[in-house]
């Protein structure tokens, strides 16, 4: 059949996080296009006379012009909230970043765990009706991270810019009743670091300065194995201090802020949240699962997402889970070095599997059944 050959075209893989878009073709390492998931619109119409001003800017261009723009993030806490802006981001991804015609490629998208049904339908509709894709599929981010680690059973802590989730997965299927969501992630940690650096006498307030603080966070922060002990060390010596050069040449020194910032993941009360830390949510999620599979979950505890990149986080997690779990349980934390991109890598693996090729939702199926087809084919 002629049509079947057509379906063999290279897939496009697009992972939309709250902070970054990761997009490309299966086999790319790292993903070909990584850019901020943001849309900027001019604050004042007609300010830039004669500069061929556009009504909107996407991604890196929006970031670089942020002085004259209002930046909007169409994904909040992992869930798409502004479809017009999201469409702009997909358009930018296909036409400007990857330079492909979406009508010629099947597209694999990712979604947050517990994504509302209406949202999945809307994603499906936009892909087929706006971008005319020949086929598409929507996969859950945490499940893809687990695949990327070479497993089909385990529990994933996926923490990005806007949201963190604990997702227990058994033989490839997420267990929705036991998923934990924590609205605490990279963006909150950047905000908290801005706050505690201000207490030290440095002032970071604007969106431009926020980017600097994010860089400080990514380069210098780490998770302490024992927070109290680390605080004592920091108080009694300067061994933990590091310096950082700002763009204007000023050098700042950062001490206990280096580990106080990510400690928030384990003690959300630092930023006034009444939630459990990521170690407790992991434990609670496992406890909501059938007693027979808990052993497999403890033994396959996979970290994923940019906010799990802090040095020391795996050891600390191991220590905390061991303290919570029954003494007979062997717990193991898996922290793959490429975990910043593991959702994307898992999606890229999935799209390449020969067994996956019959899973795509085709244009024909969409035309016959409408957007609700997504619930039957993607789960």
Swiss-Prot record:
Its EC number(s): 3.6.4.-
Locations listed in the record: Cytoplasm, Cytoskeleton
Entry keyword ATP-binding: yes
A cellular component term, taken from the record's GO annotations: cytoplasm
First-listed, main subcellular location of the protein, grouped into a coarse class: cytoplasm
Record's subunit section: Polymerization of globular actin (G-actin) leads to a structural filament (F-actin) in the form of a two-stranded helix. Each actin can bind to 4 others.
PANTHER family per UniProt: ACTIN (PTHR11937)
Name recorded for this polypeptide: Actin, muscle
Species in which this protein is naturally found: Styela plicata
